């Protein structure tokens, strides 16, 4: 499969990393991720150049990653710094590939492509995750589907009415107001739900209030698969800027052609010190992401080989505009790298 390699992807959450290496495959590339004694995260190819043992099974010795097989040691840049055998020679062939890493917004970003092109300024903004005006709860999930299926799912805001009916269904669905905005390296899908009864989830945000409300469900896409959702609610007629809202992290990183990593979070501007609201959002994440979206996209993945082998093309609905635009942008990025 063709992956877009010259881009920033999330490899891990900060709490996943310590001096014990984490092995994780990204874009069919095995990585060893670990935090060095100075706190800086290192990412090395998870293959020792000697006999190809996984370095993620090793340990840190004096700040260096030691291979579990023959004891070669590597610094965070991938250079072999110790060879315990023979005369201790360390030719260039003993060095291992390292990858650019940036820790930002409580996310570990990695650049799997040409290191010379790795510009930290191109990392999309997820500052709400560390903004003291917000409270963030989230986590990591593994999904057995091609990452593009989840991109389609997330950019299609209308699916919530059916897939997430237990929590997000609205009686104002027939009055939805939609807009798609295309910017420089960014696509937004905006949806307003005017004058409806609060959904089950929104009612929890409002502490059980049941008066007519306006609600919003927006999402922003940045290459290649980083999305920031905005769900909000306010009494009918209230400006969007005065709503209570949650900004949702939805970042997908391909693992293989048929699996991906899902980094998610909800950053809210209300009930910041309320552990009960933490529970509401964790329950929503477990239900919507694990029990609902995951089930749907994994079922589609199991049919993907048949669909592709038989040249079946998807029928289009009016709600597909944002997802289709994003799909085309990803195709352009793939073609650009392949050229």
Swiss-Prot record:
Optimum pH is between 6.5-7.5. GO terms for molecular function: 2 iron, 2 sulfur cluster binding; metal ion binding; monooxygenase activity. It catalyses: 3,6-dichloro-2-methoxybenzoate + 2 reduced [2Fe-2S]-[ferredoxin] + O2 + 2 H(+) = 3,6-dichlorosalicylate + formaldehyde + 2 oxidized [2Fe-2S]-[ferredoxin] + H2O. [2Fe-2S] cluster binds at residues 48, 50, 67, 70. It is an enzyme of class 1 (oxidoreductase). SUPFAM superfamilies: Bet v1-like, ISP domain. Pfam families: Rieske, VanA_C. GO terms for biological process: catabolic process. 3,6-dichloro-2-methoxybenzoate binds at residues 229, 250, 284. Keywords: 2Fe-2S, Aromatic hydrocarbons catabolism, Iron, Iron-sulfur, Metal-binding, Monooxygenase, Oxidoreductase. Optimum temperature is 30 degrees Celsius. Changing residue 153 to A: Strong reduction of O-demethylase activity. Its cofactor is [2Fe-2S] cluster. Fe cation binds at residues 159, 164, 293. This is Dicamba O-demethylase, oxygenase component.
């Amino acid at each position: 499969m063709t992956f877009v390699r010259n881009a920033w992807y999330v490899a891990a959450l900060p709490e996943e990393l310590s001096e014990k290496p984490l092995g994780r495959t990204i874009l069919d590339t095995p990585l060893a991720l670990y935090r060095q004694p100075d706190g800086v995260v290192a990412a090395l190819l998870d293959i020792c150049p000697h006999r190809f043992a996984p370095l993620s099974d090793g340990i840190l010795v004096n700040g260096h990653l030691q291979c579990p097989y023959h004891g070669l040691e590597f610094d965070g840049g991938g250079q072999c710094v110790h060879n315990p055998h023979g005369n201790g020679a360390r030719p260039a062939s003993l060095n291992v590939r390292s990858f650019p890493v940036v820790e930002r917004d409580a996310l570990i970003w990695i650049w799997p492509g040409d290191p010379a092109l790795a510009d930290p300024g191109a990392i999309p903004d997820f500052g709400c995750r560390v903004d003291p005006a917000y409270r963030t709860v989230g986590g990591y999930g593994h999904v057995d589907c091609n990452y593009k299926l989840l991109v389609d799912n997330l950019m299609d805001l209308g699916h919530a009415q059916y897939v997430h009916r237990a929590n997000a269904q609205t009686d104002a669905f027939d009055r939805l107001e939609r807009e798609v905005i295309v910017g420089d390296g960014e696509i937004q899908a905006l949806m307003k739900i005017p004058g409806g009864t609060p959904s089950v989830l929104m009612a929890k945000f409002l502490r059980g209030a049941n008066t007519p409300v306006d609600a919003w469900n927006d999402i922003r896409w940045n290459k290649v698969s980083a999305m920031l959702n905005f769900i909000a609610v306010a009494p009918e007629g209230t400006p969007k800027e005065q709503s209570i809202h949650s900004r949702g992290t939805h970042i997908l990183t391909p693992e293989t052609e048929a699996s991906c990593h899902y980094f998610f979070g909800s950053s809210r501007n209300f009930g910041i010190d309320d552990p009960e609201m933490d529970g509401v959002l964790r329950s929503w994440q477990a239900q919507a992401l694990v029990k609902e979206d995951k089930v749907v996209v994994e079922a589609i993945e199991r049919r993907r080989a048949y669909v592709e082998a038989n040249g079946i093309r998807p029928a289009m609905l009016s709600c597909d505009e944002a997802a289709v635009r994003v799909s085309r942008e990803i195709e352009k990025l793939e073609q650009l790298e392949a050229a």
